[in-house]
Regions:
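A conserved acidic beta->alpha catalytic loop
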Residues: 43-52, 98-99
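Glycine-rich, basic loop-to-helix element that forms the pyrophosphate-binding segment
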Residues: 69-86
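Non-catalytic, C-terminal membrane-associated alpha-helical segments of glycosyltransferases
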Residues: 224, 241-295
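Acidic donor-binding loop at a coil-to-helix junction in glycosyltransferase catalytic cores
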Residues: 181-189
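Conserved donor NDP-sugar-binding/catalytic core segment of glycosyltransferases
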Residues: 103-134
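A recurrent flexible, glycine/aromatic-enriched loop bordering the glycosyltransferase active site
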Residues: 146-165
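Short aromatic/hydrophobic "clamp" motif used to bind/position activated sugar donors
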Residues: 91
């Protein structure tokens, strides 16, 4: 029996080589008899022209569209653009730096009960590197992101790295295009879906995350994400533990002490976190201090 779902796999790409990922997805789709599918890769104004050239191999693959944009429009806009380009009933967002680890990855989504309009499969962390801050953070957070934990608060655990939605749902609840900088566009999506009682399935269908940026780059991303959180703190209320902690610290007037210490230690802490022996506890303290300093 042909699959009931037609699937558009949507991959936003920025300075990332994703040819092998796309080939793996195409292979799985081809193995599902009768599946109508397409893979759309949208390069969002990448600055690494060598990687862009390598990704042009995608132009030779059947069922694959490779779209390049001259200017970067941001994480929310590029995903909305991909949804508009899609032609199938269901869309699957996959980040370009993820890897496939399950032979039935696509099939698991195709066979999912269609009463769910959104499904998130999670991700696993690989490539152990204890000198890498992003690895340390992701590995420490992994127990909180198991399927069992995600099911306790399904709307709080949505990440665009591995997210399937009915296309009409994605069009009805698009990503907020005010989010131009890094972070939290998927968190706000989860909140909107909760507000409208959209059915979400939290399933065990992970991709592998094993490509980590340098400590310097991750610190820049962290600060950018905290700026986003500060800007949209009203919209994200109730969906960020850092916002909740900040609220209580200000209520108790303790934020002045944290801010004073942060201002004295900021440069030294950042040097440590960008070095070869980053400390995860120090990272969490830095995040709190940096966030408080934004007000």
């Amino acid at each position: 029996m042909p699959p009931k779902k037609g699937l558009s796999i949507l991959i936003p790409c920025y300075n990332c080589l994703c040819v092998e990922l796309v080939k793996g997805l195409v292979t799985q789709c081809e193995d599902i008899e009768g599946l109508r599918y397409e893979v759309i890769v949208a390069d969002d104004g990448s600055t690494d022209k060598h990687l862009c050239l390598l990704n042009e191999e995608l132009l030779d693959l059947e069922h694959v569209r490779y779209i390049t944009r001259e200017k970067n429009i941001g994480r929310a806009c590029i995903r909305n653009f991909l949804v508009q380009q899609a032609s199938c009933e269901w869309v699957l967002f996959v980040d370009s730096d993820m890897n496939i680890i399950r032979e039935d990855y696509i099939l698991s989504y195709i066979q999912l009960d269609s009463t769910f309009l959104v499904a998130y499969g999670g991700y696993e962390v690989g490539n152990e590197n204890t000198t890498n801050l992003r690895y340390l953070y992701e590995k420490d957070a992994a127990p909180k992101h198991t399927m069992e934990q995600r099911k306790l608060h399904p709307y709080h655990h949505l990440h665009t790295a591995n997210l399937m939605m009915k296309r009409t749902t994605a069009l009805t609840y698009p990503f907020d295009e005010r989010f131009k900088r890094y972070g939290f566009e998927d968190v706000l999506l989860g909140k909107r879906l909760q507000e409208h009682d959209v059915c979400i399935a939290q399933i065990n269908n992970p991709l592998l995350f094993d490509h980590f940026e340098t400590n310097d780059s991750y610190m820049e991303k962290t600060e950018e994400a905290l700026q986003t959180l500060c800007t949209f703190r009203n919209e994200l209320s109730g969906f960020s533990s850092l916002l909740t902690l900040n609220y209580h610290l200000r209520r108790w007037r303790l934020h002045y002490l944290i801010l004073f210490i942060f201002q004295q230690k900021r440069r030294k802490w950042r040097t440590i976190l960008c070095g070869e022996n980053p400390n995860l506890k120090l990272y969490m303290i830095y995040k709190l201090g940096y966030f408080i300093s934004l007000f």
